[in-house]
Amino acid sequence: MSIENSCVRLDEGRWNPKNRELLEKLIEKYRNTDSYAVFDWDNTSIQGDTQLNLFIYQIENLVYKLNPQKFNEVIRKNVPTNNFKEGFKNLDGEILNITKLANDIYKNYIFLYENYISDKKLSLKEIRNTEEFKDFRAKMHFLHNALPGNFSEELACLWEFYLLVGMTKDEIKNLAKEATDTKLGEAIGDVVVESSRILTGEAGIVRGIYDNGLRIRPEIANLYHELKRNGIDVYIISASIQELIEVFATDKSYGYNLDIENIYAMRLKSTIDNILVDEYNYEYPFTQRKGKSEIIEKFIKPKYNDKGPILVGGDAVGDENMLTEFKDTEILLIMKREGKLDNLVNDKRVLVQYRNLQTGLLDPK
């Protein structure tokens, strides 16, 4: 049956026309054959990094359930105390380390905790105008960038997740909704923040930079709908935390409308009351690189007579294993970012889909 006569129809949107055509043909070929597709979330299903934007939102709104002592513990947890690499200096050219940064962050957090987090002595607007908040914000972002630049991806991810400790899973989902709604409405692009020039502390004056904002990709949401409509199951495997992706991928206000049981992301352990603790739940593989393939092998393939995914979508090296390791995969959909997955673009199975950096929209070229 030709695509012209088929019931498979992807919205034209901003797809590269050839990519859209080949995706339609793939869906037509595998419709109602007990097949499935797997996708990354951040910068693949959406524009932007959901976990990063939650981290930004927590700082901007001081949404923490940690007392100062526990906060001080988690921001240092498992982080080596040796100096960072050459590129991670303060504005005076001094190379920094976790001890100097954490000491300053902890001192600022005590003030923020006593005056806003635990007791609203100041309004959010007032607390944001304090030197303590300015110093806290910039040094948190500096440290957040320094960790993956100096240590393992696992350490950096867990450090970020541990800032959610003390919240219930439902509280995290509510926070995820608030953060996602807010960041969908903000400009996308890099933001630079500088620490206090008055409260310089042990780390001195630093600048932090972060990539702010999120965008929905309607073409990807439509692809998921069309796959499902034709009997092809859709799975998400993400390196963000589970509760966050569950909200974005399944809440109908965002339009992806995926099944919650098909979401596999990072998971912390929790108490009997569903309060998250600062320990990873290794009953599930760590969903980066090889761990993404392990999720498919352990939890997904057995449902499909040990068949691999027919289609895999990703954008970065963390997705490379699941993009390349399954012989049944006919299309690798790469949502192209500069300098990412260049080693795969000559694979005959690859469809490269570009994006507009200024708008976050797909680029049909």
Residue positions per predicted region:
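Phenylalanine-focused residue identity feature
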Residues: 39, 55, 71, 84, ...
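Non-catalytic pre-domain segments flanking phosphatase-related domains
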Residues: 1-41, 47-100, 105, 113, ...
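C-terminal cap/substrate-recognition subdomain and adjoining C-terminal extension
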Residues: 2-36, 131, 150-151, 167-365
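Phosphate-/polyanion-interacting regions in eukaryotic proteins
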Residues: 45, 50-57, 107-214
